[in-house]
């Protein structure tokens, strides 16, 4: 999977995964003791984490070391102090998590920490990142029914929350009392919502869509932001099959933000059918296609992979790492067992017109991390009754590729992303 900008709970351009919608009646609740009174509220977690079993009320008097100890033990801290101080406390928790261990705390067998096996190193990195996220998600913020945060110096996040979670509950009364909550969310999630709100507002300029300023994709909350332009450039520049040039239909499987469909439409493709299973992604794609003025060329359909019919070209950019997501947040990054990749390959031949092609956009990062071999990929292509017609390669230019402090630097710095041209064998 690419190291593109990451909105919370993303559906990637290429991911066709959706869960059941959560309603106030089905959402989990978080409970705490407010003095002598027991209280509870709707629990919101974009990681899909259960609410903390134990929650303490906290305010500005809480020391960072004490908060860190509670958070590491899985105790939620429901903040009722100054909002800016909550942000400072979250930063203090981050510093403690990111602090190198003292020498006396380091394992005796240091070889167990740094492994030469890239798959082992990757799994340890994921475990460390998961633990970090769990600890940081223990600092909780109460929200009113209209998404207002009734804390001192709290910003107005109502519009950002509505974009992320949908309309506020108009039936429930709001209150100025910060101790009363209609719902509770980790501060970390709220800051992610703010970041996503800003990304959506300003958009992401992508040269593959043409010259500025009419080349921006506006990712909605929960939809992956396509910041890695190198794979988009391949789609913008690869020769189109003759069947497309004579008016054939193109399928974009797992459209996400709609960026690949838009790139193809900007290339002059007259008819693109773009699919995704996730409602957030389809709404995002519709918005972007409208902004870019190509909505007449692209038809959006809610589908798990393929729509009906056949196409002259089928484009798919699935999640690149075939491992199990640890949370809904990771569905854009990880695809357990390569379900989407295999689904695309196994359905391709049946959905191509004569002389049609499939374009698979895939990084070899999984191979470099020991999660899949090149031979396994080629075997899957052959088993689907396909052959490789050609391949275009590109190399990453994103920050992580040059970050020597990244635990996965060796794999990321050598990563190659390819556009595989596939056809029936």
Language model regions located:
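N-terminal auxiliary segments of SAM/dcSAM-dependent transferases
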Residues: 4, 24-205
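Conserved beta-strand signature within the Rossmann-like core of class I S-adenosyl-L-methionine
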Residues: 355-363
């Amino acid at each position: 999977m690419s190291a593109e900008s990451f909105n919370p709970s993303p559906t990637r351009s290429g991911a066709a995964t959706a869960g059941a919608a959560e309603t106030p009646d089905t959402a989990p609740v978080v409970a705490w003791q407010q003095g002598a009174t027991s209280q509870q509220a709707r629990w919101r977690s974009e990681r899909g984490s259960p609410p903390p079993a134990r929650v303490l009320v906290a305010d500005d008097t809480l020391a960072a070391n004490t908060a860190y100890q509670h958070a590491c033990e899985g105790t939620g801290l429901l903040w009722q102090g100054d909002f800016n101080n909550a942000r400072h406390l979250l930063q203090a928790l981050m510093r403690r998590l990111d602090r190198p261990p003292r020498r006396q705390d380091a394992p005796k067998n240091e070889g167990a920490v740094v492994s030469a096996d890239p798959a082992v190193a990757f799994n340890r990195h994921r475990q460390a990142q998961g633990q970090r996220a769990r600890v940081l998600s223990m600092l909780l913020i109460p929200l009113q029914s209209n998404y207002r945060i009734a804390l001192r110096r709290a910003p107005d996040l109502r519009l950002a929350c509505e974009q992320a979670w949908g309309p506020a509950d108009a039936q429930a009364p709001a209150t100025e009392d910060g101790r009363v909550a209609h719902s509770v969310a980790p501060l970390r999630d709220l800051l992610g919502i703010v970041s996503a709100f800003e990304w959506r507002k300003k958009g992401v300029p992508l040269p593959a869509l043409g010259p500025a300023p009419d080349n921006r994709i506006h990712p909605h909350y929960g939809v992956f932001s396509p910041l890695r332009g190198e794979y988009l450039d391949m789609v913008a520049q690869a020769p189109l099959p003759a069947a497309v040039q004579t008016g054939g239909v193109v399928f974009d499987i797992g459209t996400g933000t709609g960026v690949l469909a838009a790139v193809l439409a900007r290339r002059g493709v007259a008819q693109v059918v773009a699919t995704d299973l996730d409602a957030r992604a389809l709404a995002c794609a519709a918005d972007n296609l409208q902004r870019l003025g190509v909505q007449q060329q692209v038809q959006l359909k809610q589908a798990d992979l393929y729509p009906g019919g056949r196409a002259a070209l089928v484009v798919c950019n699935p999640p690149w790492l075939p491992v199990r997501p640890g949370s809904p947040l990771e569905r854009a990054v990880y695809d357990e067992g390569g379900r989407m990749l295999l689904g695309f390959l196994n359905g391709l031949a049946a959905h191509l017109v004569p002389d049609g092609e499939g374009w698979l956009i895939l990084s070899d990062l999984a191979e470099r991390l020991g999660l899949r071999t090149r031979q396994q990929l080629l075997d899957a292509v052959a088993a689907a009754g396909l052959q490789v017609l050609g391949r275009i390669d590109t190399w990453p230019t994103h920050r992580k590729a040059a970050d020597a402090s990244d635990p996965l630097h060796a794999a990321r710095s050598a990563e190659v992303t390819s556009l595989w041209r596939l056809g029936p064998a």
